[in-house]
Amino acid sequence: MKKGIFFLLVCFGLGFLPSCDTQKILTDPNLALQLENDSIVFDTVFTTRGSATEWLKIYNPHPGPIVIDEIFLAGKRYTGKSPYRLNINGQPVNEVADVELAAGDSMYVFAEVTLDPNGANAPLLVTDSIVFKRG
């Protein structure tokens, strides 16, 4: 009787092995990600040193996972300075590489800016770009 139950459990467990199929990563550079917004705007008045945070949501609408080769803050990379900081997919970094976004999944990019308006002419316009590179 114990051998019969053991045999059934083994057969039942083996039945699940074919379902553990990994999805092939989509490499076509023409497959675009969808962004909830194409701009992040901070409509905040700073009277003292302060910070504000906004977010951007990125979707993968395709039937397979996509790898984003790089996500980075352009000002920080090319000039070495930016008042912005990023939190990419839960990581407080200004750039990441090889981010896999599963089929139908999404991720958040949070942008925070810290400004000291003292001594500056108002209104203050500070810009930077978040760059997504694929393929």
How should these model regions be labeled?
Residues 47-48, 103, 122:
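Surface-exposed loops/turns
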Residues 53, 108, 127-129:
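Short, conserved beta-strand segments of beta-strand-rich sandwich/propeller modules, principally
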Residues 16-19:
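C-terminal motif of bacterial Sec signal peptides marking the signal peptidase cleavage site
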Residues 115-135:
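Terminal connector regions
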Residues 4-14:
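Sec-dependent N-terminal signal peptides
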Residues 21-41, 51, 61-117:
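Surface-exposed binding patches on compact interaction domains or structured appendages
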Residues 48-56:
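Contiguous beta-strand segments within globular domains
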Residues 57-59, 112, 131-133:
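Residue-level recognition of well-ordered beta-strand positions that form the cores
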